[in-house]
From Swiss-Prot:
EC numbers for this chain: 2.7.1.71
Protein name: Shikimate kinase
GO molecular function, one term: magnesium ion binding
Cofactor(s) the protein requires to work: Mg(2+)
Gene Ontology cellular component list: cytosol
InterPro entries: P-loop_NTPase, Shikimate/glucono_kinase, Shikimate_kinase/TSH1, Shikimate_kinase_CS
Residues that bind Mg(2+): S15
Catalytic activity field: shikimate + ATP = 3-phosphoshikimate + ADP + H(+)
Subcellular location: Cytoplasm
């Protein structure tokens, strides 16, 4: 089975939904952020602080390039990975890209106590700008799911329904 890539802003539920979806489809779950943390031996926030965002984005690109040649994966991408046009096109060539679309208010509410999100340390106006910029690429996904006010299980069922229709 071809891969399923979950994209969306941080806090949209990609990892939570991805694990449930992979289990339902009997596919392997891959979390790009976790892969990077394992390979680098440090947390994402530490990579950002010590090596910078551009270094981290390059690590993301390398991971997605390594994965696209495999099959049978449900992949949780980092929020910035799916917002990169080249990465989006690469993922669409070899699978279904599912955008978990949530409002900025939902993101802020879900992540208000999360200290491990470097981008959330920026002023709210900067976060809003980033949110809007990323949506321009997320919109190119094959499937869009409104993930506001839904449980992870409800989101998974909606993804399964939409994938079956394709």
């Amino acid at each position: 089975m071809k891969n399923i890539y979950l994209v969306g802003f941080m806090g949209s539920g990609k990892s939570t939904v991805g694990k449930i979806l992979a289990e339902k489809l009997n596919m392997k779950f891959v979390d790009i952020d976790k892969l990077i943390e394992e390979k680098e031996g440090m947390k994402i926030k530490d990579i950002f602080e010590q090596k910078g965002e551009s270094y981290f984005r390059e690590l993301e690109r390398k991971q997605i390039e390594a994965i696209v040649n495999q099959e049978g994966l449900v992949v949780s991408t980092g929020g910035g990975l799916g917002a990169n046009l080249n990465n989006m096109n690469l993922m669409k060539k070899n699978g279904d890209v599912v955008w978990l679309d949530v409002s900025l208010n939902t993101v802020l509410d879900r992540l208000k106590n999360d200290q491990d999100r470097p981008l959330l340390k920026q002023p709210i106006e900067k976060i809003k700008q980033l949110f809007e910029e990323r949506k321009n690429v997320y919109r190119l996904a094959n499937i869009r799911i409104n993930a506001d006010k839904k449980t992870p299980s409800q989101i998974v069922e909606e993804i399964l329904t939409k994938i079956k229709r394709r």
